């Protein structure tokens, strides 16, 4: 097969047989986000590379190994977004959205890009639902952002997930933690990978996020960040847990969670499952109080999360959660002959204006082929129009499920009457086809 007819390695097509699942999930997410007061934001798929270097962190795997970076003809370095938080923060800062009042609540559906080995439920192009909250330092804000994620899983019927919670402190108390980490890992310098050796001086906490099996094993006995929290961070974390307890959102404390991005401070969390193997983190996020300031703005306490759509869908399938099929065709109107086809085309247009689904022949099929097609697309009713039907102003209406046929008037009054009764038929499921006359 020619390369031009093959999708790029690490990317997937979402075909009509699956896209309806995405649409339904996205609709639920939009609805719940709106209930929490969040509004949609859309940002470019590429940004200045420096945005991610400063925001995500130049010692992270994401920036060092995984970004798609290129130079424009003018020599400007740009990168495809590897995550959504940095671009959303840049947009809020650039457009001074905070002038509209705080807090600012945004959500987005982003395609993101990371150059990494393709694995099950891990792709080079992947999709995220993200929610970001700016201008709130209260532990209640942490609980609200976590509550939104938990509510989404609830609405979708996903149950086999564990909320894991940690605090990685603020820059002040984390400085002491970094010293402890550095001292610990220096005892294993001969075993650390080259990347982690470079991190030892710049940001030893990133070693905890290393994917190397050797480094991961060493990190198991590393100092725990919770032991180094300052009083303010301890109190903040305690209050976050109190809010979650009050809302009856179950969680466990996992002191090993540090997240793979440098902008995080204080609360970090993940929703994980054992059903997806090594790619078990379906949603992750936390607080990033210094990000807006790092990008040149004023100090703006912020937090958010990203939820992987591919992993969510894989988990729903693994759990056997059935996503309802999209509505099928309500009526197929077949036309035989040029005049009848024009009449069918006109009637279909009128039917569609009632917000129901209607189709007619647009490829020149025979009547038999049209009926076969109507059955294939799951049409609930069909109607056949030919020369005789036009002359007599009558047509045959067929219930495709029962096979019952009824002769009905072929005029605008029929169309109105039909869809009035048909709407009742859809709701009750008991209407008799004769009621349409």
Q: Where in the sequence are the language-model features?
A:
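TRNA-recognition modules of translation machinery and tRNA-sensing kinases, especially anticodon-binding
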Residues: 1-437
């Amino acid at each position: 097969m020619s390369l031009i007819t093959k999708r790029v390695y690490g990317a997937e097509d979402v075909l009509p047989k699956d896209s309806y699942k995405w649409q339904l999930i996205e609709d639920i997410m939009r609805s719940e986000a709106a209930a929490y007061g969040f509004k949609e934001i859309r940002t470019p798929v590429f940004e200045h590379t420096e945005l991610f270097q400063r925001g995500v962190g130049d010692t992270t795997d994401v920036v060092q190994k995984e970004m798609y970076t290129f130079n424009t003809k003018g020599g400007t370095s740009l990168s495809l977004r590897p995550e959504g938080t940095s671009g959303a923060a840049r947009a809020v800062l650039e457009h001074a959205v905070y002038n509209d009042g705080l807090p600012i609540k945004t959500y987005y559906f982003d395609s993101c890009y990371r150059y990494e080995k393709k694995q099950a439920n891990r792709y080079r192009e992947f999709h995220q639902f993200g929610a970001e909250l700016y201008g709130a330092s209260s532990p209640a804000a942490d609980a609200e952002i976590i509550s939104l994620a938990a509510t989404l899983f609830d609405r979708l019927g996903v149950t086999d997930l564990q909320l894991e919670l940690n605090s990685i402190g603020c820059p002040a108390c984390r400085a002491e933690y970094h010293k402890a980490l550095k001292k610990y890992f220096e005892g294993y310098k001969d075993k650390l990978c080259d990347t982690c050796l470079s991190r030892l001086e710049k940001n030893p906490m990133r070693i905890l996020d290393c994917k190397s099996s050797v480094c991961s094993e060493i990190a198991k006995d590393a100092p725990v960040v919770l032991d180094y929290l300052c009083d303010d961070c301890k109190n903040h974390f305690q209050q976050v847990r109190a809010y979650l307890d009050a809302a009856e959102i179950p969680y466990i404390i996992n002191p090993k969670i540090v997240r793979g991005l440098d902008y995080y401070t204080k609360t970090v969390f993940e929703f994980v499952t054992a059903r997806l193997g090594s790619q078990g983190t379906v949603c992750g996020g936390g607080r990033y109080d210094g990000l807006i300031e790092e990008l040149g703005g004023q100090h703006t306490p912020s937090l958010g999360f990203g939820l992987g759509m591919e992993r969510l869908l894989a988990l729903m399938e693994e759990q056997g959660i059935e996503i309802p099929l999209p509505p099928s065709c309500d009526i197929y109107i077949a036309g035989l002959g040029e005049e009848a086809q024009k009449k069918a085309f006109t009637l279909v247009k009128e039917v569609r204006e009632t917000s129901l689904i209607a189709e007619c022949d647009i490829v020149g099929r025979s009547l038999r082929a049209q009926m076969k097609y109507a059955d294939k697309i799951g049409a609930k009713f069909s109607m056949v129009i030919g020369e005789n039907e036009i002359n007599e102003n009558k047509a045959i209406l067929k219930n495709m499920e029962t096979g019952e046929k009824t002769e009905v008037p072929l005029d605008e009054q029929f169309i109105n009457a039909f869809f009035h009764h048909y709407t009742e038929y859809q709701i009750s499921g008991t209407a008799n086809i004769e009621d349409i006359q």
